[in-house]
């Protein structure tokens, strides 16, 4: 199991294609994950993106877009290990805090997209 393991999901009332258009912008990746070096491993279009991760972490990350009813569930996964940390030093790290910070980064991404795509939409109304 990875030391950093995040699995999260958020519903966005918008079509997967619209969500994918927001997720696929590399400039946004630097805002959402400024310290990570992301290399696209697989661009899945309206199904999301898979990356390899380098920098302070080494591993994989994915945003999977699942069509659900009148919107999209944005699944965010990160599986990684701290870089340049010995097994002995790993035990002294605040892994819970590191996982929490990475989960918050994922929520920042999904809520930014949600806010943009659901702007002006009344609760219970269909997506635009």
Name the predicted role of every residue range.
Residues 3, 46-48, 69-73:
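A generic structural signal for beta-strand entry/edge sites
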Residues 19-23, 29, 49-51, 74-76, ...:
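Hydrophobic pocket/interface hotspot
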Residues 9-13, 52, 64:
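Generic structural detector for well-ordered beta-strands
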Residues 34-38, 45-49, 57-61:
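A generic structural signal for short beta-strands and their flanking turns/coil linkers
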Residues 1, 52-54:
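Residues embedded in well-ordered secondary-structure elements
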């Amino acid at each position: 199991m990875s030391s950093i393991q995040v699995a999260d999901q958020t519903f966005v009332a918008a079509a997967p294609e619209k969500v994918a258009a927001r997720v696929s912008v590399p400039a946004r990746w630097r805002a959402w994950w400024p310290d990570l070096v992301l290399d696209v491993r697989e661009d899945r279009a309206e199904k999301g993106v898979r990356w390899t991760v380098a920098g302070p972490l080494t591993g994989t990350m994915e945003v999977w877009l699942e069509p659900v009813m009148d919107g999209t569930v944005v699944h965010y996964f990160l599986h990684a290990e701290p870089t340049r940390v010995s097994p002995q030093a790993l035990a002294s790290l605040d892994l819970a805090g590191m996982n929490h910070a990475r989960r918050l980064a994922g929520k920042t991404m999904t809520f930014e997209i949600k806010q943009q795509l659901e702007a002006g939409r009344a609760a219970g109304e269909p997506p635009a």
